[in-house]
Amino acid sequence: MTLPDFHDESVLREHIATTMAFYDPRSLDPSGGFYHYYKDDGTVYDRSHRHLVSSTRFVFNNAMAAIEFDDPQYIEAARHGLAYLRDVHRNPQTGGYAWTLRDGKPEDTTNHCYGEAFVLLAYSTAVKAGVLEALPWMDETWELLEKHFFEAGPGLYRDEADASWNFSSYRGQNANMHMCEAMLAAYEASQDRRYLDRALLLADNMTRRQAAKAQGLVWEHYDVHWNVDWDYNKDNPKHLFRPWGFQPGHQTEWAKLLMILDRFLGGEGKAPAWLLPTARHLFDEALKHAWDHEFGGIAYGFAPDGSVCDDDKYFWVQAESLAAAALLSERSGDPSYSTWYDKIWAYSWEHLVDHKYGAWFRILTRDNRKYDDEKSPAGKTDYHTMGAAYEVIAAMRRGWK
């Protein structure tokens, strides 16, 4: 296979356009929101089920496309998605958002911090795209998070509550990582310092304090006191949002976020010295343990002893890792990260990108075979793949090549 030049901005821009074309215009449900389930060829295979993670990520996708391509159809699609979040997912009595819906009615009313992070990301990205009516919704979401989810003691967010705001004892890194991402987007949209300060607090507490309890890496699962729970989901290691084992993709995703923090704070001359070495450590360890030297690509998970415990190849792991490699290359100047960027893109282009219909396949076996023809079930939306491309394009426009 002939590979394009992944250091050419136009290549990434075209890749975003073809990925958006997989979803548009078929993703738009005229009766409200977006369809969430797609076969490889784009056929919608469940028209009535909705998931908060997809509902929010489709807003992100369309708002980002509106910024990049200056096309009013994307702004209208983003507004269409925001209306569904406000009118259908959101419970005006509690302020919470339904996790899943069936036929426009709440199915699972659990309040997940992970979902709230994407609500804030959706509102923030919409504001960046010029949808200024979403600005007060950012404030509303901050207040909801402060009231119910944030724990000042550990300086992290609680994970999940029922519809009446009774919280479980589970604590997790995944929600806090995506909350850090959302806070960075909120800061970009508003220039309100509280968002940047909170993003730094979350990053510090997860990648330094909590990582110090888990071999210097970010473990996924904790008890109510933020002690490491080494056994959570050990019997269900492929759980969609709470898998067992160290997640290489989350180490590299944190590395990406640390580099964004470094750039924002560095512009003020206030970037903590630990950001770059911590990001490098997380990325380097992830690739050391999880890169598949035989079949290529980054494995999904590795155990505390360093052995691979889940050798599947997930789309988002590769996407987040190539974005992290680009930002590490930009910040450090170390040529090894540019090499990783090229290597991960080459693998992804050959095996995960669907050059016939567009977008990325979701998951492959270790030897790069598909499991099924469900390219994009609820939660995917190719937010990770396009988000990574946007991040790299931004680095290129700052001068990275």
Per-range role (PLM):
Residues 1-401:
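Glycan-recognition and catalytic cores of secretory/periplasmic carbohydrate-active enzymes
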